[in-house]
Amino acid sequence: MRDKIKLVSTAGTGYYYTTTKNKRTMPGKMEIKKFDPKVRQHVIFKEAKIK
């Protein structure tokens, strides 16, 4: 079962991506480096719940 998650920027801009994750293969919190257009840099995005 793939669950929807939100990837929030650690730069503090409030920018986020939404994606899906397979909880069986990745039980931990996801961290991925992606582009944040507000700061025009690649920063680490951390997993958060979609409310």
UniProtKB/Swiss-Prot annotation:
Residue spans crossing the bilayer: none
Domain of life: Bacteria
The keyword Signal is assigned to this record: no
Cellular component, GO, one term: cytosolic large ribosomal subunit
A matching Pfam family: Ribosomal_L33
UniProt keywords, alphabetically: Ribonucleoprotein, Ribosomal protein
InterPro entries with a match to the protein in the record: Ribosomal_bL33, Ribosomal_bL33_CS, Ribosomal_bL33_sf, Ribosomal_zn-bd
Similarity comment: Belongs to the bacterial ribosomal protein bL33 family.
Name the UniProt record assigns to this protein: Large ribosomal subunit protein bL33
Organism of origin: Psychrobacter arcticus (strain DSM 17307 / VKM B-2377 / 273-4)
